[in-house]
A protein has these predicted regions:
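Extracellular/periplasmic Venus flytrap/periplasmic-binding protein
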Residues: 80-83, 129-132, 138-242, 281, ...
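Periplasmic-binding protein-like
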Residues: 88, 92-102, 120-124, 166-171, ...
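Solvent-exposed, acidic/polar segments of extracytosolic/periplasmic ligand-binding ectodomains
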Residues: 28, 347-423
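Sec/Tat signal peptide C-region and signal peptidase I cleavage site
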Residues: 19-24
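Extracytoplasmic "Venus flytrap"
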Residues: 31-52, 72-79, 101-102, 170-178, ...
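Extracellular/periplasmic periplasmic-binding protein-like sensory domains
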Residues: 137, 238-319, 329-333, 385-386, ...
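Beta-alpha junction/loop-to-helix N-cap segments that form part of ligand/metal-binding clefts
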Residues: 42-47, 57, 61-133, 143, ...
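Venus flytrap/periplasmic-binding-protein-like
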Residues: 74, 122-130, 203-204, 244-266, ...
């Protein structure tokens, strides 16, 4: 009798384990990191909205399996990004990692990915140039352009159309905004433009008084490479100090993470020229459909405090997740042999994204279209970016040969030099 009970009990346990195993096999675990704390919280929240739109667009399935999402929070620092990635990869055992959001995080996650060759990492939205250009990881894929690519066309537009010949810059002191200023300077300076002062501020700066006092008066415009709470704090304090210079915006200075902020300080951005991988008022039907899907989501979860329209972070996370899900569909969820088929599908993908066609170069870095924009107030009274120019097929070296591009140096506080020609 006892032996029979033991056999029955063992059979029940075996059946339960088999059932759990089969249930797990019906799911694909996707790990996602986002800046859900600190200066860039609003950016991380909108990134997650973009991710959720991609899950919805694929009916919650990829490669014939149900998508299970595990989210880990970061604060935009490299250490927090690696901690989050380690949890997802080493504890939660995710199948694919979509990470991270911010520039310095990207370099750290690239390096971490080299220690975990069994996992494929798809960049969420980070935009430092070094992430994919310097010693790239063979398992790291980026479907968004970097910060320099996101400024293609801006230098030409401010010099030749707006007639700004001398500018100063204020930007956050880290890899992404180094890359943004790098892209702006290369184009603007070759045309004859001058950057008379470059000011760098730490992420999370609360008091901009000394920075504002250091701004030169004899410039045609000031470039602002700020984001999130930093952008809003600067605008408030700049207006209180009586600042009235013409402004040029970085990619996350003039998207909905700032244009939808509370208060009147954002009004100073009306007329601001900027450049980015998207534009709020892009007339492209695919973009309009994407924006509508964002706007009509139920106001719950991440969408409870959604913006009037998707930001650069939303479209970047959407595209990254969409690429993952499409590649998984293509290989029918096959992640065997160190993701070989899956990675081949990612590498060769032509992503017909809401913000234009995206392909990858030899370093698995995005090539796509860039949008030069101007901030306007629309018929609803919302601030939005309208398209004034589109630059297609923007590659990471910005038209330079590898030899010349490498001689210019990596983006930094003083790189590139502002000059009319580069070796």
């Amino acid at each position: 009798m006892r032996k029979g009970l033991l056999l029955a009990s063992a059979a029940s346990v075996f059946a339960l384990l088999a059932s759990l195993s089969a249930h797990a096999a019906d799911k694909i675990k996707i790990g996602v990191t986002a800046t859900l704390e600190g200066t860039y919280t609003v950016l991380g929240e909108d990134g997650m909205r973009g991710y959720e739109l991609a899950v919805k667009a694929h009916d919650g399935k990829a490669g014939g399996k149900e998508i299970e999402t595990i989210v880990a929070s970061t604060d935009a620092s490299p250490d927090s990004a690696v901690r989050a990635a380690k949890k997802l990869v080493e504890q939660d055992k995710v199948d694919v990692l979509i990470s991270p959001l911010s520039g310095a995080e990207g370099i750290a996650i690239r390096d971490y990915s080299k220690t975990q060759p069994q996992i494929t990492v798809i960049n969420a939205s980070s935009g430092a140039l070094e992430t994919t250009y310097v010693d790239p990881s063979p398992t790291f894929y980026r479907y968004n352009m970097d910060g320099a690519q996101w400024h293609a066309g801006l230098g030409d537009y401010i010099y030749n159309t707006k007639h700004y010949k001398k500018i100063a810059t204020v930007a956050e002191d880290y890899a992404f905004t180094y890359t943004q200023v790098f892209g702006l300077a290369l184009e603007f300076c070759q045309l004859g433009g001058q950057i008379t002062k470059r000011l760098w501020v730490p992420l999370g700066t609360k008091d901009f008084a000394s920075t504002i006092a250091s701004l030169p008066d004899d410039v045609d415009a000031i470039y602002l490479g700020l984001g999130g709470a930093d952008a809003v704090n600067f605008l408030n304090q700049y207006q209180q100090a009586g600042g009235n210079a013409k402004l040029i915006g970085g990619s996350i200075m003039v998207d909905q993470t700032v244009l939808s902020s509370k208060g009147k300080a954002k009004e100073a951005l009306i007329g601001t020229v900027a450049a980015s991988g998207m534009a709020d008022a892009d007339p492209n039907p695919k973009w309009q459909a994407f924006a509508k899907s964002y706007q009509t989501m139920p106001k719950e979860g991440y969408f409870k405090n959604a913006f009037p329209g998707p930001s650069l972070l939303a479209i970047s996370y959407y595209n990254s997740a969409d690429a993952v899900f499409k590649a998984l569909d293509q290989v029918k969820g096959d992640l065997s042999d160190d993701n070989k088929k899956f990675r081949e599908a990612l590498k060769n993908m032509v992503l017909d994204a809401p913000n234009g066609k995206i392909t990858l170069d030899e370093n698995r870095q995005a090539i796509g279209s860039n949008f030069v924009t101007e901030v306007i107030k629309d018929e609803k009274g919302d601030l939005v970016s309208k398209v004034v120019k589109i630059v297609p097929n923007v590659q990471q070296r910005l038209g330079f040969s590898k030899e010349v591009f490498d001689k210019i140096g990596l983006p930094g506080r003083d790189v590139p030099e502002c000059k009319k020609s580069y070796p």
